[in-house]
């Protein structure tokens, strides 16, 4: 049997997501190293205010640090993946896990990415689950500023676009569920061009 590690991206963050990681030697070292690189405490952001953690400049580095600590702990326990993948920001954790770059290099890349994306903030994203594909295509044609940001499966996609346009499109969707994502911008859309 093959093993794949798939790392999530922004929107998957949650207050308390460090769990018991600070109690491990690896966790303590990585959290201290991250604080030195970033100039602020990942642990404090992850255990503090949800709005503060939700800021892109904090969310992305926090997710990267937590994900890479988890990957390192699994590796230390003799578990290794046959494949790695990531969704958006999670690609950085996947690249780290594959040995493409070291922790510090990855964190510096993620920090820069987060600052650029936050500067281009504005807009919204939403996951759309079990939807009418024809109706979705019609809405995207009628509102070209709203784009299909992620085509995750035949039953789940993510839309991204300016807040006003998203607020017009989302209520019209024929879908089982529409879940607004906890992000500060219209990521994976033309609004990120400046980033």
Language-model features: locations:
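Helix-rich "cap/lid" substructures immediately adjacent to catalytic or cofactor-binding pockets
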Residues: 2-85, 159
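Alpha/beta catalytic cores of group-transfer enzymes, especially the acyltransferase/condensing modules
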Residues: 10-12, 38-40, 98-195
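Residue-level recognition of conserved structural "scaffold" positions that shape functional pockets
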Residues: 16-18, 46, 93, 97, ...
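Positions that flank functional sites
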Residues: 50, 89, 185-186
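Short secondary-structure boundary/hinge segments and terminal tails
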Residues: 53, 92-93, 158, 189
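Gly/Ser-rich oxyanion-binding loop with an adjacent helix/lid
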Residues: 60-127
């Amino acid at each position: 049997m093959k093993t794949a590690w798939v790392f999530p991206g922004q929107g998957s963050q949650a207050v308390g997501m460090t769990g018991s990681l600070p109690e491990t030697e690896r966790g303590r070292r990585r959290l201290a190293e991250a604080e030195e690189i970033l100039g602020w405490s990942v642990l404090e952001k992850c255990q503090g205010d949800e709005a503060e953690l939700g800021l892109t400049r904090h969310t992305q580095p926090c997710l990267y640090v937590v994900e890479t600590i988890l990957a390192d702990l699994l590796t230390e326990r003799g578990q290794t993946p046959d494949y790695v993948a990531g969704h958006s920001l999670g690609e950085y954790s996947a690249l780290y896990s594959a040995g493409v770059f070291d922790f510090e290099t990855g964190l510096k890349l993620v920090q820069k990415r987060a600052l650029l994306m936050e500067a281009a903030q504005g807009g919204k994203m939403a996951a759309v689950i079990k939807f009418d594909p024809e109706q979705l295509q019609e809405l995207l044609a009628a509102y070209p500023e709203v784009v299909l940001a992620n085509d995750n499966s035949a039953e789940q996609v993510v839309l991204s676009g300016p807040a006003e346009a998203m607020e017009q499109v989302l209520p019209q969707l024929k879908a089982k569920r529409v879940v607004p994502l906890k992000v500060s911008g219209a990521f994976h859309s033309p609004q990120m061009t400046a980033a």
